Amino acid sequence: DNAKYRITYEGKWVNNPSIKPFIYTDSEMRLDIGEKATSFYDRTKQVKDSLMNEKAKTGNFDFSDLPKGGRFPFSYYKNYPSTGKSIQLESVGTTDYKCTENVETPDWQLIPDSATTIIGYHCQLAKTNFKGRTWYAWYAEDIPMPEGPWKLIGLPGLTLKAYDENKEYSFTAIGMSTLTAPTP
């Protein structure tokens, strides 16, 4: 499956929620959408990992010139390796972990009379309790794709902004494009 659409999000998260006020880390996150599969990943981390691998192949372990940032702890792939399955890849220190599970769709409550505009699209608000957090998502029915960042899927339009009730995680769309050259 090749990606046809790319949504770029500003991702913000708290590394240590016990420290107040919160200290946020941010990064450019991407959601690539294909016919069947989607991927959600930290763009800076992807570039950094690729450069590190290339340098390591040549025996060059000087990583001082690598881009800064790119610390979102995981990448998520829906309907990969097969329909109905997902993979979450997570790096902890120098160890990589892979978790394969069934795709779950959150049970969303649509909030009437809610409205905002995100990257030029009229959006409505929804709420769910999912994976131990209360999540809010602004979705655009004008973009009829039930996709969103991470596992926040299943709304009647593309999720352009999502955040948890405690404001420990947030993803806000800052751009959207159609990919002319399919991206695996």
Predicted regions and their residues:
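Extracellular or lumenal secretory-pathway regions
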Residues: D1-T116, H122, W135-Y136, K167-P184
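Gly/Pro-enriched, hydrophobic low-complexity segments
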Residues: Q124-T183
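Structural motif
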Residues: I118-I119, F130
